Amino acid sequence: MYAIIQTGGKQIKVEEGQTVYVEKLAAEAGETVTFDNVLFVGGENVKVGSPTVEGATVTGKVEKQGRAKKITVFKYKPKKNQHKKQGHRQPYTKVVIEKINA
């Protein structure tokens, strides 16, 4: 059984026991999180939401909070001696999917 959930402005396909990286959630390591925006549930009984499936939830356990690898943004204007170098590290939450309730 699998489901498509929406979190952090992104849609993610998840299965039970899978580890996923989502946008930062307000939860500490070891806490249980519930995703209510379930768009699709697949398997033997397929359920398609419009926009979400009624009563369907996905629960998971937060493994850790972290930050992704650093990316470098460099803006440059030729002939003007103008440049700007900037770095960014996106925060994320590592979640293990425990149960899909449909």
UniProtKB/Swiss-Prot annotation:
Keyword terms of this UniProt record: Ribonucleoprotein, Ribosomal protein, RNA-binding, rRNA-binding
GO molecular function: rRNA binding; structural constituent of ribosome
InterPro entries: bL21-like, bL21-like_sf, Ribosomal_bL21, Ribosomal_bL21_CS
GO cellular component entries: cytoplasm; ribonucleoprotein complex; ribosome
Origin: domain of life: Bacteria
Transmembrane segments: none
SUPFAM superfamilies given in the database record: L21p-like
GO biological process: translation
Pfam families documented for this protein: Ribosomal_L21p
Alphabetized PANTHER family for the sequence: 50S RIBOSOMAL PROTEIN L21, LARGE RIBOSOMAL SUBUNIT PROTEIN BL21M
Family: Belongs to the bacterial ribosomal protein bL21 family.
HAMAP family linked to this entry: Ribosomal_bL21
Subunit structure: Part of the 50S ribosomal subunit. Contacts protein L20.
General function of this protein: This protein binds to 23S rRNA in the presence of protein L20.
This protein's name: Large ribosomal subunit protein bL21
